[in-house]
């Protein structure tokens, strides 16, 4: 089912709120293709780029993030270039994701530097991306998150190159959850981390 993004109001401080805070595309090769666009970085800082069907998601070290269309969450937050975010932001976001999962009675742990696991199976990946623009002192940045939410398959079953097993909230709980509610929780818990690191 398509994400009902128009019903979501994040009610956040750094990340934008309201109906215009989400840049939604039903299908994208990667949310980073929009989030790292210079004009988007200048005009849409604080907005969330999200898609229901990401065909070529980006992971660390050039790896691909695989998600199930209309089942999972794949999004990027446009950070602009006013701050120089680094690993500390990822660390804070990992802690936030562990907390969000605990609200669903799921015990998760952090696998440094940027992944979240449940029972030794990956459920969340976090990526901080930079793009340097000519004549700019600081790079433009975007924070991307992929979470296995309602998918019903282990990534290793469809990608023979995958080195780890994966899981999802559905596989752990045995039931689907509303992605809109989960997205709002994630954004509300990540927002303080961006505020904190942005002022360091």
What is the role of each PLM region?
Residues 44, 60, 111, 121-123:
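Short beta-strand-initiation
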Residues 1-106, 176-177:
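N-terminal lobe of the biotin/lipoate ligase/transferase fold
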Residues 51-52, 112, 145:
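A secondary-structure boundary/capping signal
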Residues 22-24, 112, 148:
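Active-site proximal loop and beta-alpha junction motif in alpha/beta enzyme cores
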């Amino acid at each position: 089912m398509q994400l009902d993004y128009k019903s979501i109001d994040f009610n956040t401080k750094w990340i934008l709120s309201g109906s215009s805070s989400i840049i939604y595309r039903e299908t994208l090769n990667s949310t980073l293709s929009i989030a790292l666009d210079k004009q988007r970085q200048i005009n849409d800082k604080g907005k969330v780029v999200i898609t229901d069907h990401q065909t070529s998601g980006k992971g660390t070290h050039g790896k691909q993030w695989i998600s199930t269309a209309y089942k999972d969450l794949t999004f990027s937050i446009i950070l602009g270039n006013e701050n120089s975010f680094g690993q500390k932001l990822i660390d804070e976001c990992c802690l936030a994701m562990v907390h969000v999962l605990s609200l669903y009675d799921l015990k998760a742990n952090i696998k440094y530097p940027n992944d979240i696991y449940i029972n030794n199976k990956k459920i969340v990946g976090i990526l901080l991306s930079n793009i340097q623009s000519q004549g700019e002192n600081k790079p433009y940045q975007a924070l991307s998150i992929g979470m296995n939410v309602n998918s019903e398959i282990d990534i290793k079953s469809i990608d023979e190159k995958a080195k780890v097993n994966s899981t999802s909230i559905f596989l752990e709980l045995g039931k689907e959850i509303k992605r809109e509610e989960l997205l709002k929780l994630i954004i509300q818990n990540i927002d303080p981390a961006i505020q904190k690191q942005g002022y360091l």
